[in-house]
Amino acid sequence: NVLLIDGTGAAAQPGQTVIVQNGVITEVGPVKKVKVPAGALTVDGTGRTLMPGMIGMHDHMYYSAAGGRSAQMSYTGPRLYLGAGVTTIRTTGSQSPYGDINLKRRIDQGMVPGPRIYVTTPYLTGPGGGGTMSVAETPEQARRFVAYWAEEGASWIKFYTNISREAMGAAIDEAHKQGMKATGHLCSVTFREAVDLHIDDLAHGGMTA
């Protein structure tokens, strides 16, 4: 008897029954028309809303605090995402990439609760930018960076403001060869240049190049 938002853009539908078997939705319809299988575990949805899990496309597993400090949230982070209805996230830039990768593995193995995670590499920038971020001075360094993190389990790479066009192009090419995708918080490379280099996604569009 739940209010159902099905994610298609259709109006919310009250008084719906949703049947789930072995983790798969097998039937959806009005309470009076859908027969609940004998012995099924039931949840009374009266006064509740059911909708598909949301997908977060720009998320982090760390929390920035005053004074330039930050804290990794490997325990609370995934639980907070689930609590907000977010069942898939992309960590768009990581300060603790191994922490994110290991967390993803634990979630995938059912050891801890959390959303499906697409892990992004550490931020990749150019000389003179990004503080403790990884720096690629040459296209070859950029390729090696991507190949390394692909092997470690990252599925996206994120560029930061000082990356050069040449290093970025090489990294995107290598990422696509490795089955990865690329995004960027850009400045030294314009959005048009990034598109010409076949970047997959652009971050912070309203505040960068």
Q: Where would I find each of the regions flagged by the language model?
A:
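Residues that scaffold the ATP/ADP-binding catalytic core of kinase and kinase-like folds
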Residues: 28, 64-65
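Divalent-metal coordination cores built from histidine and acidic residues
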Residues: 45-64, 70-186, 190-209
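Short, flexible helix-adjacent loops and helix caps
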Residues: 7-9, 66-69
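Histidine-rich, glycine-flanked metal-binding segment
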Residues: 4, 8-51
